[in-house]
């Protein structure tokens, strides 16, 4: 889901000093992606990020087709309300900011959410189908990259910011307990988005930045 936008301060959590914006290839990064910790804790939050927010999950135009192609495999997992919304307006719409996002139910749930009958935990139906080998596509990259938000700039570069959201306080706590930086938690989707070579360069940069902070 897409919550209100936030431009985090480039401030190190270790020494409290401000760090410059970093760059790896054609990607600008807020340094707190390297210095802050995060690890999703579904048992604690119940998957609330798929429910809360003021619009659906941000989409790339090509991802609409992926969602449409995935729909037959996941439709049975969706609520009747979600299926009705999809039948009426499709899997995506343009929100009040003009951004392409997933359709939502009653201003809350992404239409691709499903719930565990025993725990009540909310899951992504497309990711569930992918993990079970029923589809070849996992989920929108904006969902996979969270809590990183990507913004494409007019000069051709991409900008990555660490998005702080109050519903993810349990993930911050768990990340700190594990000592797991945001960029390591998101190794798989970052590699999927920018490539293995890019991620390897990010790891080298992270080692340099974090060494300077010790």
Where are these regions (language model features)?
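Short loop/turn segments that flank or connect secondary-structure elements
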Residues: 1-214
């Amino acid at each position: 889901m897409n919550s209100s936008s936030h431009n985090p301060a480039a401030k190190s959590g270790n020494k409290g000093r401000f760090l410059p914006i970093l760059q790896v290839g054609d990607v600008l990064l807020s340094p707190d992606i390297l210095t802050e910790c995060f690890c999703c804790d579904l048992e604690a939050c119940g998957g609330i990020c798929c429910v809360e927010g003021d619009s659906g999950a941000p989409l790339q135009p090509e991802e609409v087709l992926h969602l449409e192609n995935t729909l037959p495999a996941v439709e049975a997992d969706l609520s009747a309300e979600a299926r009705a919304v999809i039948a009426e307006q499709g899997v995506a719409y343009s929100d009040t900011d003009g951004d392409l996002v997933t359709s939502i139910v009653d201003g809350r749930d992404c239409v691709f959410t499903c719930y565990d009958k025993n725990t009540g935990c909310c899951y992504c139906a497309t990711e569930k189908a992918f993990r079970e080998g029923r589809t070849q596509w996992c989920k929108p990259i904006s969902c996979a990259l969270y809590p990183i938000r990507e913004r494409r700039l007019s000069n051709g570069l991409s900008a990555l910011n660490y998005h702080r959201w109050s519903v993810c306080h349990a993930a911050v706590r768990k990340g700190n307990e594990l000592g797991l930086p945001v960029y390591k938690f998101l190794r798989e989707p970052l590699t999927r988005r920018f490539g293995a070579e890019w991620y390897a360069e990010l790891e080298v940069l992270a080692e340099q930045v974090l060494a300077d902070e010790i």
